[in-house]
Curated annotation (Swiss-Prot):
Cysteine disulfide partners in this protein: none
Pfam families xref list: Antimicrobial20
Lineage: Eukaryota, Metazoa, Chordata, Craniata, Vertebrata
Record localization: Secreted
Tissue expression profile of the protein: Expressed by the skin dorsal glands.
Organism: Uperoleia mjobergii (Mjoberg's toadlet)
Protein's GO biological process: defense response
InterPro entries cross-referenced by the UniProt entry: Aurein_antimicrobial_peptide (IPR013157)
Main localization (coarse): secreted
Protein name, as recorded: Uperin-2.7
This protein's UniProt keywords: Amphibian defense peptide, Secreted
GO cellular component, one term: extracellular region
Domain of life where this protein originates: Eukaryota
Length: 19
């Protein structure tokens, strides 16, 4: 659902930032 998409988005951003 929307929450899953949001989590994926946050995970991708964290990955890019190297956090």
């Amino acid at each position: 659902g929307i929450i899953d998409i949001a989590k994926k988005l946050v995970g991708g951003i964290r990955n890019v930032l190297g956090i």
